[in-house]
Amino acid sequence: MLDRLNRKQSKERFVNKIPISTTKIDKSLEHTRRDDESNNAKRGVNPDESYSSDTSFTPTVVSGTEDAALTRTSTNRQRQGKSSFKSFFRTMSLKVNSKTRNKDRKTKEELAAEKALAELRNLPRNPLDLELNELHVASNFNEVRKIIDDIFIDENHDAASKAIRISTQNKSFSAMEKPYSLTKIKSLQTEDDYSLPITSFIIETLEENSIHADLSHNDNAITSTDILIEEEEEMEQEEEEEMLNYDDLDVISDKIDEVGAESSISTSNDRGIIANATANGPIIVGDSTESVDTSNIENRKLVVVNSTPDDHDYYATNDMNDNFITPNPSNESVETLAGVYKDFEVTNATEANTEAGKTTDINAETSNAIDAVADTENKVTAEDDATDTVNTGESMTDTTTSTTDNKNDKEVDKEVENAVDSNVTTNDTIPDKAANIDNESSSDNSIDATTANTTNTNNFNDAEVNTEATNTIVDNVTNDKFNSVDVSTTTPTATTVSGIPTADEMTNNVNTNRISTATVDSFTGKTGENYESFITNAGKDSNDNNADLKTPTNNSATTTTNTQSGVSNKKSNSKTGSSEQNPFQKKLMNYLNSLN
């Protein structure tokens, strides 16, 4: 059976671990679903009993594919136990000792490595056509963490500094920011964190983690950086994801063949990358071969190119200078690395604009310097002009002085006095007249006009004000009347009507007479009458001299009771001793009832 599975492993999936002994089934299987016609049910076997070797089921390998090629024809008893053994293998695979594992069978790590290498063989050919090292698969998760921690991230590259997501077969690891400034990551995906999913990768290291390659065994060169490829899915999902599916790789190969060799990526010869690719060019990961030329590794850069099914390619480098490989697709339909190429062009344009801006700033500073020099020259010229003016003034003064000296002192004084008097007279008379005339005429006219307008405005406004005041007075009067009625009828502090006690008096009187809460019949009122008589005669004083509130004497007559003069008129059918009560009596009844 095992040999048959080994022959089928390239096309079908199989259970990875099969226990040697099946004489005892785990008790957890007692909860598995069984048909009522199960052989166990017919034989009456207790699920807790151990199965003997002659009644145990033959292990049935279950295929997860639709055609179920490995599901062999079996008896009814074997078919009934198929689901049980499926769960059984799943449970026992966690308990099987590693020594019981079939040594001929490949481990999951080895199968994952084969899948990764198969994907790499089907990647598009690289521009430099370098060789790719065969991956060395690590043996435990701790080595993977060490590798992830050694990933160098440019601390100045904010987007890439967040995290690099490395997607291996089904497992994703996140490498957090490290204090290195070596690797810059770019991706075609427009994601915020610039995640770079790559199926396989080689990390170029410098001093911290250098790669030691044995060039004499180029195909089998092993680096000190071990890579673990591990599944992410749990045991239930391993049925679909744990085995290598060559059909998927064939699809990848077919899609690559459809693109055609004429659409492969080429690099610009103008940069001279091809000439120094072997000696100084970057290390390319993602070629169709299985080895990498690691010569002169200290001075070379890392480039990772990856292709995944139904996805774009990814490009990573830690250098943006001469060794940066510029993708130049020969066919516009090819999306491989096109986004990176555009980003690189944009980066160059941005840098060019930055340089142009710096040049502009320098030119502006130069212009400012020239302006400053010009200002200085103008200032000097202005100072020279001022000096010339002063000199001219001095010469004129000298001439005047010399002329004045030739005249008699008396004449000079007389001329000066006359000139002063003349000026004073002119200044005193002419401006005063002009000012008086202008001011008076303009002021008079403006004042008159303003006064007239003011008068008219005041007259008009007075009418409005009077009207508004009249309306206000009417409203206030109305409100006062309404308020007086409202206050007198609703507030307990209204003007007391003769003969009707206020609320406070009522409370005091009731408390004074000590209302009994045990029964209503025991109540003794203010006048010494019983409860019913007191309620009927409510509102009377002790002398029965209430002029405003009269108690009807006719038991059958319907009268109008004036409860409060000027406030409200209410009609009540009052009968002595009847259940009909006026509003005051109702309020009093409610109050008394509330005391009980």
Curated annotation (Swiss-Prot):
Biased segments, Polar residues type: 49-63, 71-84, 534-548
Induction field: Expression is increased with increased iron.
Disulfide bonds: none
Biological process (GO), any one: intracellular iron ion homeostasis
Compositionally biased intervals (Basic and acidic residues): 25-40
Disruption phenotype: Decreases virulence.
Region (Disordered): 25-84, 378-411, 424-461, 534-596
Transmembrane segments: none
Compositionally biased intervals (Low complexity): 434-461, 551-579
Keywords, in A-Z order: Transcription, Transcription regulation, Virulence
Free-text function comment from the UniProt entry: Transcription factor involved in iron utilization and virulence.
UniProt name for this protein: Transcription factor IRO1
Gene name of the record: IRO1
